[in-house]
Regions:
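A glycine- and charged-residue-rich anion-binding loop/surface
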Residues: 10, 34-38, 45, 58-59, ...
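Broad gene-expression machinery/nucleic-acid interaction feature
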Residues: 17, 124, 139-141, 285, ...
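Hard-cation-handling environments
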Residues: 193-329, 333-353, 357, 363-511, ...
Length: 543
């Protein structure tokens, strides 16, 4: 029997990480992060790896399908807990090296390059990477030979008929696997609701070049930093249109550096202009590639919109091309930045105003259907998506005649069994899955996050109670984030009065801790009455 335990990526978008276990051996497929958008000082969120201990297996390795952060970003945190080798395609490992170096764990890491068609063994598993197309270079699916037969994990994919790097989706290999028999297919569910062709990266290049050629000033392209295919096309466009590429933003600089080092970005040496020289060039000679397509406040696009970027300032006649999908939930921030740019006389182009400036890297429903047709699996488990995406993808598999289909979420085991030529998937035990929030490289306790959230919603009150020689307490009370209006002094005075009343009623033998608690309750009670708020309240008693 094969057991599959998703630690992340099922029931959500991002943080992809899945364990496969048989005979006491386990491998992880991908190890990614997600982000917390609540504004609580969280850098990244990664899977809780403790369920691996409860799985009762020895983790032999991590197999990386491609280099997106939601597939590799948690590796530094995993390696601090499990000393395991990491297998992955060259470009992904280039990004992994950069990430591990930042966390000072590269020296002890074992990174092993994979290649499509090159089979290798990890414990009781045999693994074959297969070329797929995606919005990042060097993306692969994996075929895993297990005790129950062949398991195919697609990773992130789409069917791009004209990939910019010439690395085509290997439909023939998937078809051959289908001929030989696939027990289980686990397939990318992200765009299951989208009908129609997914679109090719090469088509994006044509649309953007038309906009660059007609622009009277500088052109700024905001995109996901990891889309090396698009970055490659922009370099070719810049050369033909006699412009220089300027990279603004740490992410795009890192990806360009790794891509050039690994041969995936064949730019001529003179195509890139250092950002500190951008102000010296004629605007029509510049093609800037910037981070911040999702409205991130500290990213390059937001800084350009605020006119506080040290290297460049936008001006009337410039053109911004939003060459990225806006992730649901980010719309207010993205629209606010676009508005700031427009107030500066900048033309803003989006996929809504100009078709073709962006295509998705994830398979639309027809591509998902094609993957099932090629592999003809006996069993199916949808991966990578919310419960809505997973359920819709499962429905598609059933429509196409897949005999055994299971929908699971993070922490719920799927058991795969096979008897002669019959195979089935069943939901097994719930081992559990959690999330670890990280700030400054260190985990943040859930209690700390809860307190931060409470402070953000309700504010903070600070109270110092000083007992002098006469025994009558002096009460000093200040607040932050509770009030700032004409009623403020009156409400503050009322809260101080409540504290004094509470202290006056304290029993004679009450400790300072007892008095502090009486004061805390009085403050919260007073502000609940006057402000409908219960601020986090800190009380100190001094004598």
């Amino acid at each position: 029997m094969l057991r599959i335990l998703p630690l992340g990526g099922l029931g959500e978008v991002g943080m992809n990480c899945m364990a496969l276990e048989q005979r006491g051996d386990a491998i992880l497929v991908d190890c990614g992060v997600t982000f917390d958008d609540r504004g609580l000082g969280v850098d990244v969120v990664h899977p809780d790896f403790s369920p691996l201990d409860r799985l009762g297996a020895h983790v032999r390795a991590v197999i990386i399908t491609h280099g997106h952060e939601d597939h590799i970003g948690a590796l530094p945190y995993l390696l601090k807990r499990h000393d395991v080798p990491i297998y992955g395609p060259p470009y992904a490992l280039g990004l992994v090296r950069s990430r591990l170096e930042e966390h000072e764990v590269l020296a002890h890491a074992r990174l092993i390059e994979t290649a499509p068609g090159r089979v290798f063994e990890v414990g009781s598993f045999t693994i074959e990477p297969i070329r797929v197309t995606h919005s990042i270079a060097d993306a692969t699916a994996i075929a895993i030979t297990t005790d129950v037969g062949t398991v195919v994990h697609t990773g992130d994919f789409k069917l791009d008929p004209t990939p910019p790097d010439g690395e085509h989706f290997d439909a023939a290999r998937f078809s051959k696997l289908g001929d030989d028999g696939v027990t289980l297919l686990m397939s990318d569910s992200t765009n299951v609701d989208v009908e129609g062709a997914t679109g090719s990266e090469s088509d994006v290049g044509e649309a953007i070049e038309r906009l660059v050629a007609s622009a009277p000033g500088a052109v700024i392209v905001a995109m996901f930093a990891s889309n090396i295919h698009r970055l490659r096309l922009l370099g070719e466009i810049a050369k033909r249109q006699r412009r220089k590429i300027v990279l603004l933003g740490r992410g795009v600089g890192t990806h360009a550096k790794v891509a050039r080092e690994t041969g995936y970005l064949p730019w001529p040496d003179d195509i890139v202009l250092p950002d500190e020289l951008a102000r010296e060039r004629v605007r029509k000679e510049l093609l800037l590639v910037v981070t911040g397509s999702q409205g991130e406040d500290r990213a390059a696009l937001a800084r350009l919109a605020r006119a506080d970027h040290p290297s460049f300032e936008v001006a009337p006649g410039d053109r911004v091309i939003m060459s990225a999908r806006t992730i649901p939930g980010n719309e207010p921030d993205v629209y606010a930045i676009q508005g700031q740019l427009m107030r500066r006389g900048v033309e803003v182009i989006t996929a809504r105003t100009e078709r073709g400036v962006h295509v998705s890297g994830h398979a639309h429903r027809p591509d998902q259907r094609k993957m099932i047709e090629l592999t003809r699996p006996k069993c199916f488990v949808p991966v990578h998506g919310t419960i809505h995406h997973l359920t819709r993808h499962a429905e598609l598999a059933r429509e196409m005649g897949v005999a055994s289909v299971a929908v699971t979420e993070n922490g719920r085991v799927v058991e795969v069994s096979r008897d002669d030529d019959r195979a089935r998937v069943m939901l097994g035990e719930t081992i559990g899955a959690g999330r670890v929030h990280v700030w400054g490289g260190q985990p943040i306790a859930p209690s700390v996050l809860k307190m931060r959230e409470w402070m953000a919603e309700q504010g903070v009150a600070f109270c110092v109670i000083t007992y002098g020689a006469g025994g009558v307490p002096d009460v000093l009370l200040e607040t932050r984030g509770v009030m700032d209006d004409e009623r403020g002094p009156k409400d503050l005075e009322a809260a101080v009065h409540e504290v004094r009343e509470a202290l006056a009623g304290a029993q004679e033998h009450a400790t300072d801790e007892d008095r502090a608690e009486l004061a805390r309750q009085a403050i919260r009670r007073s502000f609940k009455h006057s402000r409908m708020m219960r601020p986090v309240t800190v009380v100190k008693v001094r004598r």
